[in-house]
Amino acid sequence: MTRTVIGFVAFALATEHVRSSDPSPTPTPDKSQYTIFNPTPIDLRRPYNTDRPSKTDSPYTIDAGVFQVESDVWNWTLDYQNGVRTRTWIASNTNFKLGLTNWMDLQVFPQFYVNTRTSGPAYGTPVEHDGFGDTTLRLKINLLANDGGKLAIGFLSSLKIPTNTGNTGNHVWEPGFELPVSYSLPWGFTLFAQTRIDILDKPRSSKMRVQWQNPIGLSRTIVGNLSGYVEFYDAVSTGPWVGTLDTGLIYQVTPNFSIDVNAFFGLTDNAPDYNVFSGFGYRF
């Protein structure tokens, strides 16, 4: 999968080089002077974009001085393995984003409520936990084509902080970093992908483990303001690999507000069986 992502980037860079030889390209306004203290004027803002709802993040950052909220209203996951059924319910899984410069934004991503219930014939008495979830800090920079171009590349670093209560998570700080990319295809399609490394807690051990994620997908406008996407996600670590098929619909209510509904399906035994959720994004 990683070879696929790298090959995709190499091909897109070559194509973009040919495209850039156009003798009369549309000039891009210089926005390098704008910061959180000198916000980007509204008429110079780039098109609205979010890091939701697919597992692949956007390579674009929000404009300097802009505040944006992206949130799951509800998120329900079911996993059944070896006679044990685990149900997870998350409410208000919210990403607060602030544009720092024309090419960098800061994100604070708390889980306001998490409820897990474990049961099944191989488990015994059902156990339920609920409370505040973890908080993730993220810093994203755009490396290419933040304000135009077929190929866009970003870089995102993150740190999960164990703020959970009520035994809804582990108590380990978990860093990660990723390289998200997108490429505009003919007929209105967009190809998106990323490669990501996380340093995660290893269950029932004092050691950490490395997880490598490589989602890839396609998105397109369906009709009017309604668009959809399909994504294949895989993650490899010290245990069995995880694969899911992800899909969803996004409706652009206004130029600064979108809503979405999504369903992810496990393709491997080690993946959650079902994950359905709905949410929104809003740019102030």
Language model features with spans:
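Bacterial N-terminal signal peptides
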Residues: 3-12
